[in-house]
């Protein structure tokens, strides 16, 4: 299964509660924090919620 490397590039401060909760659910707490997740529809939906705060790259597993 493909993997996604998700990096937080902007702060969640000033965002909605839902955006901050989504960052926490993805495992992102600080700027430049990176996490690797499976490429699943649920994760893609979370990324869509915070697309302006994160950078997403596909990585080989």
Swiss-Prot record:
| Gene3D superfamilies associated with the record | Ribosomal protein L30, ferredoxin-like fold domain (3.30.1390.20)
GO MF annotation terms? structural constituent of ribosome
Task: Please give the GO cellular component terms listed in this UniProt entry.
Answer: cytosolic large ribosomal subunit
Q: Name one GO biological process term.
A: translation
**CDD domains, alphabetically?**
Ribosomal_L30 (cd01658)
Membrane-spanning residues: none
Pfam families for the chain: Ribosomal_L30 (PF00327)
Q: Which InterPro entries has this protein been placed in?
A: Ribo_uL30_ferredoxin-like_sf, Ribosomal_uL30_bac-type, Ribosomal_uL30_ferredoxin-like
Look up keyword Ribosomal protein and say if it applies: yes
Q: Which UniProt keywords apply?
A: Ribonucleoprotein, Ribosomal protein
**UniProt KW Metal-binding keyword:** no
In which family does this protein belong, per the annotation?
Belongs to the universal ribosomal protein uL30 family.
User: What assembly does the database describe for this protein?
Assistant: Part of the 50S ribosomal subunit.
What is the official name of this protein in its record? Large ribosomal subunit protein uL30
Organism in which the protein naturally occurs? Frankia alni (strain DSM 45986 / CECT 9034 / ACN14a)
């Amino acid at each position: 299964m493909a993997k996604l490397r998700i990096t937080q590039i902007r702060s969640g401060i000033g965002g909605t509660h839902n955006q901050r909760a989504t960052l926490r659910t993805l495992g992102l707490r600080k700027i430049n924090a990176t996490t690797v997740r499976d490429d699943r529809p649920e994760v893609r939906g979370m990324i869509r919620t915070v697309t302006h705060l994160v950078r997403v790259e596909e990585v080989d597993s």
